């Protein structure tokens, strides 16, 4: 947030609400996974939101992460530059976001570049990394490194096939939603709005 002044009023309240969503425990888990997944000499950042942002801000760690989820030779980002120029770093973040979407992360789970670059919504960055980890665990293609229990496995399609005979048998069953013609009935019930006759 070096380029932005302090926010006041409603903007401040909104920013505080966004900052409350940030999870320090999740940060530790994500840092451990990224370092393990990349399997390179990536230094562990000091704990804290500002350090986490600074660690990811140039885009190199994110690009190495998405490349490590592909087999060798099929990496989506062939050239990762460790440039100090702002627009180059933002371009690398954008490349990561596009590659994550192609990998299978839903558009609704992807953060905006300014969320990371300006530190506006680091919780959104965490959500994107969690979604990326979930997709990697679900794919189970051998490229994921780390504990499978760190991320939720996404639901998979499970089609069922029924024969014509099974479908015909299902038509003979009276479902419980259809009601029953036995047992309790509405006999003796009064209509709505009528007073109850007690004698």
Swiss-Prot record:
The annotated region (Disordered) lies at 178-199
**Calponin-homology (CH) domain span:** 24-136
Q: Which PROSITE patterns match?
A: CALPONIN_1 (PS01052), CALPONIN_2 (PS51122), CH (PS50021)
List keywords of the entry alphabetically: Phosphoprotein
Q: Which domain of life is it from?
A: Eukaryota
Parts of the chain that traverse the membrane: none
State the CDD domains in the record: CH_TAGLN3
Recorded family membership: Belongs to the calponin family.
* Protein known as: Transgelin-3
Tell me the classification of the organism that encodes this protein.
Answer: Eukaryota, Metazoa, Chordata, Craniata, Vertebrata
Name of the gene: Tagln3
